C-alpha cells in the first residue's frame, strides 16, 4: 500500500511516497512496522543558484587635466598670483623695513634672484593643479582663506608699487 502525502503541513516533501506493509496476523512476536521514507529532491531550474556578491568595480581614474582646464577662470592662475603676491608683499615689506629702499630699487639690484624665486613658486603651485589635488584645510588655513589673503596681497602689492612709483620713496 502506498500513501501519498500532499499536505503542506507535513514534514515529508509533497509528492513523496511512503511504503507501508501490514504485519502478518499469525506472528507470535510483537508486530513490527516497517516504514520506508522515500524522499526525492529536485533541482528547480527556475531559480538561479545563489552567488556570492562580487565586489563593485573600482571607479575610473579621472583623466589628467589639460592646460586650458588648469589655467581656466578660477583655476590655478588666481591661486598662483595670490601666492606670489603674498610672498612678494611680505618680502618687500621686510626688505623695506631692513634697508629703507623701495621695491623698485630692490628689484633693480637683484632681478635674476627675484625672477628665479617667482618661477620656482609658480612651478611648485602648478604641480598640485595638474595632479587634480585639492587643498586640505589645516586649522585656519583653508583654501578659501588662501584665496582671500591672496586677493588682498595682490591689491596691497599693487598699491605699494603704485605709491612708490609716484612718490619715488619707500612706503615703510
From Swiss-Prot:
Family of this protein: Belongs to the ELIP/psbS family.
Entry function: Putative zeaxanthin binding protein. That forms photoprotective complexes within the light-harvesting antennae.
Localization in the cell: Plastid, Chloroplast membrane
Name of the protein: Carotene biosynthesis-related protein CBR, chloroplastic
Organism: Dunaliella salina (Green alga)
Record's compositionally biased regions (Pro residues): 46-63
Membrane topology: Multi-pass membrane protein
Keyword terms: Chloroplast, Membrane, Plastid, Transit peptide, Transmembrane, Transmembrane helix
Name of one Pfam family that matches: Chloroa_b-bind
UniProt lineage: Eukaryota, Viridiplantae, Chlorophyta, core chlorophytes, Chlorophyceae
Location of region: Disordered: 41-66
Major location category of this protein: plastid
GO cellular component: chloroplast membrane
Alphabetical list of InterPro entries matching this protein: Chloroa_b-bind
Transmembrane segments: 111-131, 152-172
Amino acid at each position: 500500500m502506498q500513501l501519498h502525502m500532499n499536505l503542506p503541513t507535513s514534514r515529508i516533501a509533497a509528492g513523496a511516497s511512503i511504503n507501508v506493509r501490514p504485519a502478518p496476523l499469525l506472528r507470535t512476536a510483537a508486530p513490527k512496522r516497517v516504514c520506508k521514507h522515500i524522499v526525492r529532491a529536485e533541482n528547480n531550474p527556475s531559480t538561479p543558484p545563489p552567488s556570492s556578491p562580487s565586489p563593485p568595480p573600482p571607479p575610473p581614474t579621472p583623466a589628467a587635466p589639460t592646460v586650458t582646464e588648469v589655467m581656466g577662470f578660477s583655476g590655478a592662475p588666481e591661486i598662483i598670483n595670490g601666492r606670489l603676491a603674498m610672498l612678494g608683499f611680505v618680502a618687500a615689506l621686510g626688505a623695506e623695513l631692513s634697508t629703507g629702499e623701495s621695491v623698485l630699487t630692490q628689484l633693480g639690484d637683484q632681478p635674476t634672484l627675484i625672477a628665479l624665486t617667482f618661477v620656482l613658486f609658480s612651478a611648485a603651485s602648478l604641480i598640485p593643479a595638474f595632479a587634480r589635488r585639492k587643498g586640505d584645510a589645516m586649522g585656519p588655513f583653508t583654501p578659501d582663506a588662501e584665496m582671500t589673503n591672496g586677493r588682498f596681497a595682490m591689491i596691497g602689492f599693487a598699491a605699494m608699487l603704485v605709491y612708490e612709483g609716484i612718490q619715488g620713496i619707500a612706503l615703510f
